[in-house]
Amino acid sequence: MEQAQWVDPALFSAFVSIIFFFLGMFLGRISLGVGKGAAPRSPSSTEWPDGPPKLPIIGNLHQLNKGGELVHHKLAKLAQSYDRAMTIWVGSWGPMIVVSDADLAWEVLVTKSPDFAGRVLSKLSHLFNADYNTVVAYDAGPQWQSLRRGLQHGPLGPAHVSAQARFHEEDMKLLVSDMMRAAKKGGNNGVVEPLAYVRRATIRFLSRLCFGEAFNDEAFVEGMDEAVEETIRATGHARILDAFYFTRHLPIIRRSFMNTVAAKKKIESLVRPLLSRPAPPGSYLHFLLSTDAPESMIIFRIFEVYLLGVDSTASTTTWALAFLVSNQQAQEKLHNELAQYCASQNNQNIKAEDVGKLSYLLGVVKETMRMKPIAPLAVPHKTLKETMLDGKRVAAGTTVVVNLYAVHYNPKLWPEPEQFRPERFVIGASGGNGGGSSEYMLQSYLPFGGGMRACAGMEVGKLQVAMVVANLVMSFKWLPEAEGKMPDLAEDMTFVLMMKKPLAAKIVPRA
């Protein structure tokens, strides 16, 4: 998911001086459009809500990057001084409406979903979005609907996911054995960093969805793992380019573009050979080959599955494990549920079909996604027609960003939102239902967005996270890497919301 980000705080101060130096030189050449479907600089008929005072050229960037805080935190704090929505200005992007209220977020994402179903994406992303011809990049319309339906009814459909259950279980056994081997490696003292192992397990799973249940190519798994990382790293300066388009002339941005092109070529070399292989019915490749899309478009529609699925799933899983290391009582409660269920079924491991029957496991996954939504600002929405929002007129082409983090941390909706409490999502448990009615809780829990532009792979993503967490907790007791050294829960925002310091934990095999 290409979520809304602004300029990296570490780069911002250096760029401010450059911006003013180049302003006079390039003023006549600045393009105000931003990527695909860019909104006009200021749709004249929009009734903009109040917002913090802005500076010329940079808008509100000086406030968003102040103190090194991540943007979703800063926007949540700024929103406390304004109404349910505010206007934020970001360089060449011009103004956008930022929503931090649960009711208003529901209006944008669900109630008036068709009105806000357009996309605003970064300039560099067109290289990986088949020139904006992928599920995440399309504005809502017939092409988007056809592609999304093919993805959800085929590879992401329940029948196809269930058909690979045996392979999925083998993935979990391989993951556990790999972690065991890493823990026993000389000098590790039982300490492992699970992120890399979870990434590989996720790529194997996604590869079978894309290419069929029998797909088994470890060289491809390794290559795709590297390609996803290189893509994210190569596009790291994309938001500098979007916010200040004249920076395209700077060496650092030009190098970023060249690295992006190199990553694109690597992806093509990985995926292109697979297009000539037989495509099993139900696989994503089978569906894509049935369309009239050119080869280049098929390649990057496949890559979209990995780009959106690998880091989001792996990061959410490691966040969950970090919370369980920090909350041993919750970990033991989860293990007891898993052990009792396995004993009742005479099983040693948790299977995909079991996940929906394990209420505390689901609570752990949902609470993790509440606290660490993988894209805390979601993907920027664009109005496709004139509409109303919070009683104000919003013109077609207006950018609207929903701060999911602010909604998930509203103490009026979620008592003690900073506390990890899986019981919020367990009906009948103490603190269940988030302290409110289940219907309202549904409207204020939006880790995948909502409405017609909700994440197409959310059910598969939740299943994969639950499967990995369940089998790793069933197999190991997770402890701090050293006595008294709890995981660092500081955040880092690259392509998705990740742990700033990757989780390292000591694992002890359970009897």
UniProtKB/Swiss-Prot annotation:
Topology class, membrane? Single-pass membrane protein
| Cofactor(s) this protein requires | heme
**Cellular component aspect of the GO annotation:** endoplasmic reticulum membrane
**Location within or outside the cell:** Membrane; Endoplasmic reticulum membrane
Q: Which UniProt keywords apply?
A: Endoplasmic reticulum, Heme, Iron, Membrane, Metal-binding, Monooxygenase, Oxidoreductase, Transmembrane, Transmembrane helix
Question: Chief location of this protein?
Answer: membrane
Keyword Ribosomal protein listed: no
Q: Which PROSITE patterns does this chain map to?
A: CYTOCHROME_P450
Q: Which gene encodes it?
A: CYP719A37
What is the designated name of this protein?
Piperic acid synthase CYP719A37
Binding sites annotated in the UniProt record for heme: 455
Named from the GO MF annotations, one term is: heme binding
- Report the EC code(s) recorded for this entry: 1.14.19.-
Q: One Pfam family of this protein, by short name?
A: p450
Q: Which InterPro entries match?
A: Cyt_P450 (IPR001128), Cyt_P450_CS (IPR017972), Cyt_P450_E_grp-I (IPR002401), Cyt_P450_sf (IPR036396)
Chain ranges passing through the membrane: 7-27
Pathway where this protein functions: Aromatic compound metabolism
Could you tell me what reaction this enzyme catalyses?
(E,E)-feruperate + reduced [NADPH--hemoprotein reductase] + O2 = (E,E)-piperate + oxidized [NADPH--hemoprotein reductase] + 2 H2O + H(+)
Expressed in which tissues:
Specifically expressed in immature fruits and roots. Barely detectable in young leaves and flowering spadices.
